[in-house]
Regions:
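ATP/Mg2+-dependent ligation/transfer catalytic cores
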Residues: 1-166, 188, 208, 361-380, ...
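A generic structural motif
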Residues: 4, 78-84, 142, 182-188, ...
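Short glycine/proline-enriched loop/turn "hinge" motifs that connect secondary-structure elements
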Residues: 62-69, 105-107, 167-172, 220, ...
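Short, hydrophobic beta-strand segments
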Residues: 73-79, 176-182, 229
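Short, conserved phosphate-binding/catalytic loop or strand-edge motifs used
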Residues: 112-116, 170-178
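Active-site-proximal beta-alpha loop/turn segments in soluble metabolic enzymes
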Residues: 130-140, 173-187, 217-222, 238-241
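Loop-centered beta-sheet repeat module
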Residues: 189-196, 205-212, 227
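Catalytic-core signal marking the mid-to-C-terminal active-site face
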Residues: 194, 201-204, 208-209, 232-289, ...
Length: 386
């Protein structure tokens, strides 16, 4: 299986004995929107006759699936014998390679929020909010889940070795959050991509619908795809963001990464919030990554530094919405952080107190997807060559 630009999976079933063989599929799977409209992407669509891409199974990613007698394998994408330029996983690989060229290995951990919806013939699409009378934030038992899905998802994730740290109820009834174990960037993104598919399919088997939309209901808070990020030296070593004795315990490398994220805040939005609905979440007042600022254990800032230090020192990027493609959201984050290092940027002072009542900046994410696309034209989407 592989990811399209929307973060949706494509693939095929093959017998295990043929796992090492490359597949061939129309490259248009990468040039479709969620309504299956083929987009006029030069070099990949009608202008070149809808040619094939090649799928290259990565046997090292093989893991037990959630369907009977079925394993899951991630595939890399090639086009004319070269890595497919518009492939989301390839975009993340380029970002990882750029950091490795500087001697650092990016480490990521994903927090994935979503809503479980129940059948409702009167609701749009036939599904509406899940009814949990005793719901409470971070609730357990019937205070967080009346469907049994939490245990089903956790059990399947354990079998698939997706390395979940935990699952819990979130702010509104039916909203849940999965926390995934920290790891090397590509492995972490692979696991997040697979986990999205697994959760949706297992819910469907029980008659429910899981949605990762940024904000499916205006009366409820949105769902995010928070990405935790740090660096370690290539070949092993201690967390390069941690520096005992430095201001806030953060190294100059960490401050420059924060500086890059803040400098390119508006340009990050289009890959972090890739749908029209995403911008119903990115508004002030619901601690969702709106302002171009950072803070010390402050959820009203977009780039939060949790209180832990040492090996756990990290930047939590709170902008990406649940519908973001894990590969692309991670790639643009790593690229923006790298530009902060290349350009020697500093992050300035952290946001203090309530960042919505008294933000320390007037810069924020765009209000519409079209504005986000325009912002991307005025920021550097990838590390400079010079």
């Amino acid at each position: 299986m592989w990811s399209d630009l929307n973060g949706l999976s494509h693939g095929r079933y093959v017998p295990a004995r043929r796992l090492h063989e490359h597949g061939h599929h129309a490259v248009t799977t990468l040039c479709m929107n969620i309504n299956r409209d083929i987009l006029p992407v030069d070099g990949y669509a009608a202008d070149v006759g809808f040619p094939d891409l090649s799928t290259v199974p990565l046997v090292e990613t093989r893991r037990t699936g959630w369907e009977v007698d079925t394993d899951v394998v991630i595939a890399d994408l090639e086009f004319n014998g070269e890595p497919l330029a518009i492939g989301p996983r390839n975009a993340l690989q380029r970002a990882v390679d750029a950091w490795r060229a500087l001697g650092y290995e990016p480490m990521l951990g994903f927090e994935m929020e979503f809503y479980v919806l129940q059948a409702d013939p009167d609701a749009p699409g036939g599904f509406g909010p899940l009814h949990i009378p005793s719901h409470r934030v971070y609730g357990v038992g019937t205070g967080g889940d009346t469907t049994g899905l939490m245990f089903d998802l956790f059990d399947a994730a354990e079998v698939a070795e997706l390395d979940l740290e935990g699952i819990m109820g979130e702010f509104h009834p039916g909203q849940m959050e999965l926390n995934m174990k920290y790891g090397q960037a590509m492995d972490a993104a692979d696991r997040a991509f697979i986990c999205k598919d697994m959760t949706r399919e297992l819910a469907a088997h029980k008659g429910y619908c899981i949605t990762y939309m940024g904000r499916p209901n205006a009366a409820m808070v949105g769902s995010g795809l928070h990405i935790n990020f740090s660096l370690v030296p290539v070949g092993g070593g201690t967390n390069a963001f941690d520096e005992a004795g430095a201001e806030y315990g953060l190294s100059s490398l960490a401050r420059q990464c924060l500086g890059g994220l803040i400098a390119h805040h508006e340009g990050l939005a289009v890959m972090s919030a890739p749908t029209v609905n995403s911008y119903k979440r990115l508004v002030p007042g619901i601690i969702a990554g709106y302002w171009a600022n950072w803070g010390l254990d402050n959820r009203s800032s977009t780039y939060r530094i949790p209180y832990e230090r040492g090996a756990a020192t990290r930047i939590e990027n709170r902008m990406p919405c649940g519908s973001a493609n894990p590969y692309l959201a991670a790639a643009v984050m790593l690229n923006a952080a790298l530009l902060g290092v290349v350009d020697g940027l500093d992050c300035g002072t952290p946001q203090a107190g309530d960042g919505d009542e008294a933000p320390n900046t007037d810069r924020h994410t765009p209000h519409k997807l079209a504005e986000a696309v325009a912002c991307l034209l005025y920021t550097s989407p990838s590390p400079r060559d010079s």
